[in-house]
């Protein structure tokens, strides 16, 4: 039996539950109680909120460089290859971090990993703010990427394992919340850029990117301060490790469920535990998981490639379309993210319990393909009409991302595998997705330099591949009791 730190002693819980006793005789009983989710879930919602806080920080750190990359290029006199190195360093770190984080999430538990990874963000953010050259900056961004990579598998595990199975706020909706959280973080980074752009004297405008990158340490410190008070281990993972008493304790504290383990269950021989190992990565390509892994991987790769090329390059794209000021670029980028990507993400959370992740992803890719083909045809806008149409196409792309694959690729990654494989499943998915991000972030400056707006013809291949993949593999993770596969 795996030894588990009593994380519940750190979680506030209010009064002890006094309702009907729910007897927990095995891990399947714990999963069923979580899936039903019919009783008070105040602390469970707090855990989900803190997990989303980690995702918020991931998004902020990944997107914070978008407006500063031009200033960094000028300050350090970077070539296109050097710009790509700085821009992609964080995703290189995330590739390594996701593999390690996925394994550790299954090996030592969600709680321990979640409590530790914020250190990467604090140290790296401060190092970025004071980087004397591009090499220190790239190194600090790599360390920051390690934190992002480690954080996402464990955050997705919490979102999956602290939500009910069906109905409003189900597992798919909980996981989809990562999407509007992501866009909220991007929008806040834009607002911070706008604020500091307004208050910094022109003689110190080169401080802007340093302040924005360094600011990431503040939310990390806040999360460190509050997560130790409210976080607890996943009851599903604890039960899966054979620790029913720990799982029942978490259910009482986080869910207000009066769960107890009967004495006869405690007297039973220790159950066979699904031990985490590096070989579990191979299990993702065996049996029924091969088909799911293939779909989740394809969707994540193409979605990440297209989104990073467009969203990271959004300020560059807008300033290319409209030879305007930095202020105009910031305001248009902020409006597009809030009105379309963020709103699309909120709709995804609300509608996925009804329509499912598969159909909503299909609709999102269709929107993106239409938008990218429109941008490719328009090229560099001439006149107001073409300029407005180009911005409308960018808006359609971002709405399709928020409504479709942006929200639901994580559902395919998180809810295609049971508890015993969820960490490595998300870890592998993130590794491959970040590889796609690295490629797009590195290639985007080079492609734009050589192809200008014709680059949209290349990017349009991504949603096309997503559409074909969904039509070829019709797997719906929403509403399916995936954790039951550990007990069959």
Predicted regions and their residues:
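Transmembrane-helix signature of 12-pass secondary carriers
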Residues: 2-488
């Amino acid at each position: 039996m795996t030894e588990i730190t009593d994380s519940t002693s750190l979680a506030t819980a209010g009064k002890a539950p006094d309702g009907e006793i729910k007897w927990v005789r095995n891990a399947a009983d714990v999963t069923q109680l979580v899936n039903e989710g019919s009783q008070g879930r105040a602390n469970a919602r707090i855990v989900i909120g803190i997990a989303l806080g980690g995702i918020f920080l991931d998004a902020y750190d990944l997107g914070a460089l978008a407006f500063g990359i031009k200033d960094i290029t000028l300050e350090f006199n970077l070539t296109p290859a050097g710009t790509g190195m700085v821009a992609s360093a964080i995703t290189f770190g995330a590739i390594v971090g996701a593999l390690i984080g996925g394994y550790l999430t299954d090996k030592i538990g969600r709680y321990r990993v979640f409590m530790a990874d914020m250190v990467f963000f604090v140290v790296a953010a401060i190092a970025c703010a004071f980087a004397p050259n591009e090499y220190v900056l790239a190194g600090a961004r790599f360390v920051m990427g390690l934190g992002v990579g480690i954080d996402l598998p464990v955050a997705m595990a919490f979102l999956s394992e602290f939500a009910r199975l069906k109905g409003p706020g189900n597992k798919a909706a909980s996981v989809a919340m990562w999407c509007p959280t992501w866009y909220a973080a991007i929008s806040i980074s834009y607002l911070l850029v706008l604020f500091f752009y307004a208050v910094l004297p022109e003689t110190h405008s080169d401080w802007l990117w340093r302040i924005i990158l360094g600011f990431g340490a503040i939310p990390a410190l806040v999360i460190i301060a509050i997560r130790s008070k409210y976080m607890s281990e996943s009851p599903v993972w604890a039960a899966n490790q054979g620790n029913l008493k720990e799982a029942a304790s978490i259910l009482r504290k986080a869910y207000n469920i009066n769960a107890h383990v009967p004495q006869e269950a405690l007297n039973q021989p220790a159950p066979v535990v699904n031990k985490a190992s590096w070989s579990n990565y191979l299990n993702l390509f065996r049996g029924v998981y091969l088909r799911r892994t293939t779909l989740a991987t394809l969707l994540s790769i193409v979605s990440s490639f297209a989104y990073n090329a467009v969203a990271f390059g959004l300020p560059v794209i807008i300033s290319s379309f409209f030879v305007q000021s930095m202020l105009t670029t910031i305001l248009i980028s902020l409006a597009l993210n809030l009105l379309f990507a963020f709103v699309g993400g909120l709709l995804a959370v609300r509608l996925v319990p009804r329509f499912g992740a598969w159909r909503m992803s299909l609709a999102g890719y269709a929107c993106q393909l239409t938008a990218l083909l429109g941008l490719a045809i328009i090229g560099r806008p001439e006149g107001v009409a073409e300029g407005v149409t180009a911005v409308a196409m960018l808006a359609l792309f971002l709405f399709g991302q928020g409504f479709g694959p942006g929200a639901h690729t994580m559902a395919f990654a998180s809810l295609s595998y049971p508890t015993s494989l969820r960490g490595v499943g998300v870890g592998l998915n993130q590794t491959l997705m970040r590889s796609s991000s690295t490629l797009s972030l590195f290639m985007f400056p080079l492609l734009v330099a050589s192809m200008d707006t014709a680059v949209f013809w290349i990017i349009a291949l991504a949603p096309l591949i997503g559409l074909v993949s969904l039509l070829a593999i019709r797997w719906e993770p929403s509403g399916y009791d995936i954790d039951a596969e550990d007990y069959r």
